[in-house]
Regions:
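Class I S-adenosyl-L-methionine
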Residues: 1-17, 22-25, 29-126
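Thr-Gly-centered strand-to-loop micro-motif
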Residues: 103, 157, 178-180
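Structural motif
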Residues: 37, 160, 179-183
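Short gly/pro/ser/thr-enriched loop/turn and capping motifs at secondary-structure boundaries
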Residues: 41-44, 134-137, 185
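Class I SAM-dependent methyltransferase SAM-binding "motif I" and its flanking Rossmann-like core
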Residues: 105-172
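A contiguous loop/helix-start segment that scaffolds small-molecule binding in enzyme catalytic cores
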Residues: 7, 169-188
Length: 188
């Protein structure tokens, strides 16, 4: 019988290393390998907010594997990058290694890593998800703002929102959170 490891989707929280959950920190320290997304800057250097968080948490850097996720509206290159990472993850877990795949904020909330989580589950290796603090929750707390009270409604939409939908929400006096804002800069 083959010895297989486990896969964890590890939420890193909104960027402040003190806002990572205890469960996520324990997982980061326990896994054998950590996959961490990054992007290339205009100057061609790799940058990764996730890696910055891991460094601030003093996670063992020898087990971190930084991978590039191309950022563009055409997601084909990013999907290819995720496919490559999934191949590496599957190889590792089949050899008995435990693997963490990091995501900023919460790994189940507007996370690009969901492509990998789904693909790994389809391959017969479900990902144990570890919840995190989404950025909009942390932002509200940082300024003492209650996002919603009692019967108020909260609407979360992606940055590529349609202008009419945005106006309807504003007229309806609902609390609105727009995620992935660079996608909708032209609209805003």
């Amino acid at each position: 019988m083959e010895n297989t490891g486990k896969i964890f989707g590890i939420s890193l929280g909104p960027g402040d290393p003190e806002l990572i959950t205890l469960k996520a920190l324990k997982a980061l320290n326990a896994v054998d390998v950590i996959f961490c997304p990054g992007t290339k800057s205009g100057e061609g250097r790799m940058k990764s907010r996730a890696l910055d968080i891991l460094r601030q948490l003093e996670v063992d850097e020898t087990k971190i594997r930084l991978f590039q996720v191309p950022m563009s509206r055409d997601r084909q290159e990013a999907l290819c990058a995720y496919d490559r990472v999934c191949g590496e993850v599957l190889e590792l877990v089949r050899s008995g290694k435990s693997v963490g795949i990091t995501a900023e904020g919460d790994a189940c909330f507007y996370s690009s890593a969901h492509y990998m989580y789904g693909q790994l589950a389809q391959a017969g290796f479900p990902v144990a998800m570890i919840a995190g603090v989404p950025a909009f929750i942390a932002a509200g707390a940082s300024v003492g703002l209650h996002l919603v009270k009692q019967q108020e409604r909260l609407l979360v939409i992606p940055g590529d929102v349609i202008v009419e939908e945005l106006l309807e929400t504003i007229v309806g006096k609902r609390t609105l959170v727009i995620m992935k804002v660079p996608l909708g800069e032209a609209v805003l």
